[in-house]
UniProtKB/Swiss-Prot annotation:
Keywords: Cytoplasm, Endonuclease, Hydrolase, Magnesium, Metal-binding, Nuclease. Belongs to the RNase H family. Its cofactor is Mg(2+). Its EC number is 3.1.26.4. Its main location: cytoplasm. CDD domains: RNase_HI_prokaryote_like. This is Ribonuclease H. The keyword Nuclease applies. Mg(2+) 1 binds at residues 9, 47, 69. GO terms for cellular component: cytoplasm. It catalyses: Endonucleolytic cleavage to 5'-phosphomonoester. It comes from Solibacter usitatus (strain Ellin6076). GO terms for biological process: DNA replication, removal of RNA primer.
Length: 146
């Protein structure tokens, strides 16, 4: 099974507002950059979309280390999601899970792979995370012009 590193980031101008996401896939010496945007969204939705699209780009089952600077995504996928599913996608406060559509898509993609999750400090020393931030911000800016 291939070992892949997936680095993700999301950006939003306004929150809500125009947003962008990006993902970098690393396999051995290969590197692939992905990015996209939405006209009206939130930062959390873009963080989730980055992880979904990065995982979706993998055509076969892989061992994936997902690197994110989003504590929301990290805690959601590693800590909260099992409880949400048990409770019919309701939070501990008995309210519907925000961004449920994307959490379901992320769960679907994660289950295709052997995934581990790593948090990295944003805007710091992780070169690929900084590149993801640059791509996501650029995508959000381009979306805001259209």
């Amino acid at each position: 099974m291939k070992k892949v590193q997936l680095i993700t980031d999301g950006a939003c101008l306004g929150n809500p507002g125009p947003g962008g996401w990006s993902a970098i896939l690393r396999f051995e010496e290969q590197k692939k950059e992905l990015w996209g945007c939405e006209k009206q969204t939130t930062n959390n939705r873009m963080e989730l979309t980055a992880a979904i699209e990065g995982l979706r780009a993998l055509r076969e089952k892989c061992q994936v280390e997902v690197v994110t600077d989003s504590e929301y995504v990290l805690k959601g996928i590693t800590t909260w999601i099992d409880g949400w599913k048990r409770k019919g996608w309701m939070t501990a406060a008995k309210k519907p899970v925000i961004n449920q559509d994307l959490w379901k898509l992320l769960d679907e993609q994660v289950n295709r792979h052997q995934a581990t999750w790593t948090w990295t400090k944003g805007h710091a020393s992780h070169a690929d995370n900084n590149r993801c931030d640059e791509l996501a911000t650029r995508a959000a800016r381009e979306q805001s012009k259209s």
